[in-house]
Structure formats: structure tokens, C-alpha cells
Swiss-Prot record:
PROSITE patterns: ALDEHYDE_DEHYDR_CYS. The active site is at C286 (nucleophile). The keyword Ribonucleoprotein does not apply. GO terms for molecular function: malonate-semialdehyde dehydrogenase (acetylating) activity; methylmalonate-semialdehyde dehydrogenase (acylating, NAD) activity. The gene is iolA1. GO terms for biological process: inositol catabolic process; thymine catabolic process; valine catabolic process. Coiled coil: none annotated. Pfam families: Aldedh. Keywords: NAD, Oxidoreductase. The keyword NAD applies. Catalyzes the oxidation of malonate semialdehyde (MSA) and methylmalonate semialdehyde (MMSA) into acetyl-CoA and propanoyl-CoA, respectively. Is involved in a myo-inositol catabolic pathway. Bicarbonate, and not CO2, is the end-product of the enzymatic reaction. This is Malonate-semialdehyde dehydrogenase 1.
Length: 486
């Protein structure tokens, strides 16, 4: 249950809740009110070393358990997550700020990833070919890597960790997790439920902290692989540093997702889709729609209706079901977002909806309202940068060809969407867009867990994405066996 008392969040290492050796801690506010709800211990190198040692010690025992038996633990974990869905969603809203509706959606998507991980035995199966030569057979086997680490962001404190450790652990690895130090309460609950499911101690370890923890993950000789989700500059650092130290790395980075709106789209459904994609979760998601490229023929009609509907969106505490947009994560991030809105005005974009001017029921919360700019061009910062907020830029284009060109000019290529009723236009868009995840009349083209999740260009550093077969391949190594018997 959620308590009104201030909590103190600790590391979980080798079966025990412990404070970091440094004694450092940070304050965790409720973004909706600014009130302190928790403190969190902040780790350094020594704490990471302890967590890795615990994971390394239990690895031989854990990896020796047959894979069907390992996944049975996950079935129990899945059941516990299901039984605690409402509590988990409320924790997310409390410390992240997103609406309870969005938090409930995140919880469900996270549980679906655990469902996927329970099918690990079939996904780990290798290949075999008999009689590759006279009396000789060939086969491919998959084995776990050892100790692996995960670094996850504040914006999806449940779903993203569950992209990582359930699948990695089902494959036979042991895990050290660093969630965002901004959302430690949900991390604690995920670990508590994990061990309620009966997993041996040391299989999953949790360390809170900042760049010292990240850099130790990247250089620790006993960590075999690192999964990361976060901003583009850090993703690039994680990939370059980790691979330089011989580690397998997948680093999912930033985004500037475009939606191309064609004249033949269903206007009403498209507007509702854009509202959710741009302003849901306060725009703090790597699959948010942050740019709409609307074809001139429909632009005025589309924007008139979009602005009208946007102004109806309520801003406030995510615990209130009537509010569509909750706070952003911190006061510092709010100030950053406001500076981008100022920049858009200064650079000549037309401000149609101003999120700086909202009535705040809780003035100490970190609120930014839905914001829409029109006549945005590619030389403006609001088009170029990931703002991570409920700020939507509208670029007017002459046709599909220009819409594709504008979309592909972004350095990011995470997701992209087209709204159309033309199969020909959709096919052309799908084939020519650079993005790693594409939607056709799908507002947020985040795939189900049995598909891989990864972008292209500056949105992804690595080869294998998260989830699905990519996830299993990332968390295992192949051995090719050629054998003959006399």
C-alpha cells in the first residue's frame, strides 16, 4: 500500500536492503505538489561492486536450473504483478506525475513483457543440421552471458525495467539494475514482488545512483552486457564506453517522432490520435508525437479543430481522472521546457496554444500545459531537439513527398506515423521512412512485446533491440557445435 509517510529507498544487494556506503541521498518530490515523498540512497563504485559480486556468485547455480523451471518463477511473478496492478499504477503517478490512466496502461504493457519472457524456452531453441559431412552433425546452442546490467529512465519506471531483467534472467543471466533515481519507489516494489515469487537471492540486485553507477557498469570486468534507455548524449556515451570495454550494449536513445497527416485521413480520429500521442504522459516518452507534418490542403481545417480540442485538455494532478496532462518530472525540467517555448516564439513560429498560461491548482507542482506551434521550420530548435514535454510543432508540407523528406531530415528515427486512407501512400511511407517503428493510423507505434523495440540513426546505438527474438539474442551467446562419433 502507498503510505503518506516519507519513505527511504535503499539498494537491494544479495537479498538485503542496504544504504549506499557513501551515505549520500537525494530527496524525491511528488511532481504534482512539490512535496517530499521519499529519500533515496545514492550509490558509488563500491556499491556496484558488491551488487555485481552477488550476481556473479549466484550465476552458476541459476544458469544451471533448466530453462522451463526458470520461467516458472516468472509465472508466479506475473501473477503477483497482476494482483498489484492498481497499487503499482498509483505509485507511478505519485512519483512520476503521469495521469493514472497512462500509468495503468504502462503497468499493463509491463506485465505483457513478463508474459513474453515466460516463453523463453521456445525462443532460446537453437538450430541443427544432420549430416553436414559424412557422419558429422552441426548444431547451434544458446547460453546465458553471465552478469548483465540495465539502466532505465524515469518516464516508464515499470515497463522499461521489465523489458530487461525478466527476459535476461529467464535466459539464465543474473542482473544488476539501476533505475532512475527520480523514481525509486516503483523500483523497490518491483524487486519486492520479484522475490515474493521465490527467486534465489542475488539473481536480481538494485542499485540507485547517477553517473558513477553508470560508468562503473560500463567498465566493470564482470559485467558482460548493458541495456540502456535514456537521452541521446548518454546513450552514445554508454555505447562507446561499454563496447570499448568489450561489452555487448544496446542503447535506446532520444526521439523526434513525426506524424504525416494526409488530406484523405479521417480528420476526427486523427485529431484524437494526435492529442494522445503528443500530450499523453505529459509528452515525456520516447514515442511521443512531437512534430506533425500536415499537407497544405487540409492544414487550416485540421489545425482549427486540433486547437479547439487541445484547449479542452485539463492539466493537474494525475490522480484526478478528469486531468489529461499531469506535471513534468522536476522543476528544472519545467524551466527547460519553458525555455524551449520561449525559443520557438523568438525564432518566429506561430504559437497557437500556450502551455505557459495555465491555472495551477497546486502552484508548487511542475506543470506545463499543452503547447502547439504552427509554421515551424527545420532550422528551429523546437523542431531539432527532443523537448520531452507536451509541446507539438506543426510543419506545413505540400504533399507526401515533402512530408517524408521533412521526417527523414531529423537526426532521430525512433517512430513515425502516417494518417491516411490510401494504401499506396501508406506503403510508400513505410518503405521510405528511416524510423525503426512505423505506424499507419496507429497513434503511438510502440510494438507489442513479441516484436523488437528499437529506432534508427541517433535514436539507437547497437544492433539488437529490446523484446522479442532480439532480446533473447542480446542476452545469450551462440555456440556452434560440429560433432562426430566413432
Amino acid at each position: 500500500m502507498i503510505s503518506s509517510e516519507t519513505k527511504h529507498m535503499q539498494n537491494y544487494i544479495n537479498g538485503k536492503w542496504v544504504d549506499a556506503k557513501s551515505g549520500k541521498q537525494e530527496v524525491i518530490p511528488n511532481p504534482a505538489t512539490g512535496e517530499t515523498i521519499a529519500t533515496v540512497t545514492i550509490s558509488d563504485v563500491e556499491d556496484v561492486d558488491m551488487a555485481v559480486a552477488a550476481a556473479k556468485e549466484v550465476f552458476p547455480e541459476w544458469s544451471d536450473i533448466p530453462v522451463p523451471n526458470r520461467t516458472r518463477y516468472l509465472l508466479d511473478y506475473w501473477k503477483l504483478l497482476q494482483d498489484n496492478k492498481e497499487e503499482l499504477a498509483k505509485i507511478i503517478t505519485l512519483e512520476n506525475g503521469k495521469s493514472l490512466r497512462d500509468a495503468q496502461g504502462e503497468v499493463q504493457r509491463g506485465i505483457e513483457v513478463v508474459e513474453l519472457a515466460t516463453s523463453t524456452p521456445s525462443m532460446m531453441m537453437g538450430d541443427a543440421l544432420p549430416s553436414i559431412a559424412k557422419g558429422i552433425d552441426g548444431s547451434i546452442w544458446r547460453y546465458p552471458l553471465g552478469v548483465v546490467a540495465g539502466i532505465t529512465p524515469f518516464n516508464f519506471p515499470m515497463m522499461v525495467p521489465l523489458w530487461m531483467f525478466p527476459l535476461a534472467i529467464a535466459c539464465g543471466n543474473t542482473f544488476v539494475l539501476k533505475t532512475s533515481e527520480r523514481t525509486p519507489i516503483l523500483a523497490e516494489r518491483l524487486v519486492e514482488l520479484f522475490y515474493e515469487a521465490g527467486f534465489p537471492k542475488g539473481v536480481l540486485n538494485l542499485v540507485h545512483g547517477g553517473k558513477e553507477v553508470v560508468n562503473r557498469f560500463l567498465t566493470h570486468p564482470d559485467i558482460e552486457a548493458v541495456s540502456f534507455v535514456g537521452s541521446e548524449p548518454v546513450a552514445k556515451h554508454v555505447y562507446q564506453t561499454g563496447t570499448a570495454h568489450g561489452k555487448r550494449v544496446q542503447a535506446l536513445a532520444g526521439a523526434k517522432n513525426h506524424a504525416v497527416v494526409m488530406p484523405d485521413c479521417d480528420v476526427e480520429k486523427t485529431i484524437q490520435g494526435v492529442l494522445g500521442a503528443a500530450f499523453g504522459s505529459s509528452g515525456e516518452r520516447c514515442m511521443a508525437c512531437s512534430v506533425v507534418a500536415v499537407v497544405d490542403d487540409i492544414a487550416d481545417e485540421f489545425l482549427e479543430k486540433l486547437v479547439k480540442e487541445t484547449k479542452k485538455l485539463r492539466v493537474g494532478d494525475g490522480m484526478d481522472d478528469s486531468n489529461f496532462i499531469g506535471p513534468v518530472i522536476r522543476e528544472s525540467h519545467k524551466e527547460r521546457v519553458l525555455s524551449y517555448i520561449d525559443s520557438g516564439v523568438d525564432e518566429g513560429a506561430h504559437l497557437l496554444v500556450d502551455g505557459r498560461k495555465i491555472k495551477e491548482e497546486t502552484p508548487d507542482g511542475y506543470y506545463v500545459g499543452a503547447t502547439i506551434f504552427d509554421h515551424v521550420t527545420q532550422d528551429m530548435k523546437i523542431w531539432q531537439d527532443e523537448i520531452f514535454a507536451p509541446v507539438l510543432s506543426v510543419v506545413r508540407v505540400s504533399d507526401l513527398e515533402e512530408g517524408i523528406r521533412v521526417t527523414n531530415q531529423s537526426k532521430f528515427a525512433n517512430g513515425a506515423v502516417i494518417y491516411t486512407n490510401s494504401g499506396k501512400s501508406a506503403q510508400q511511407f513505410r518503405n521510405r521512412i528511416d524510423a525503426g517503428m512505423i505506424g499507419v493510423n496507429v497513434n503511438v507505434p510502440a510494438p507489442m512485446a513479441f516484436f523488437s523495440f528499437a529506432g534508427n540513426k541517433a535514436s539507437f546505438y547497437g544492433d539488437l533491440g529490446t523484446n522479442g527474438k532480439d532480446g533473447v539474442q542480446f542476452y545469450t551467446r551462440k555456440k556452434v557445435v560440429t560433432e562426430r562419433w566413432f
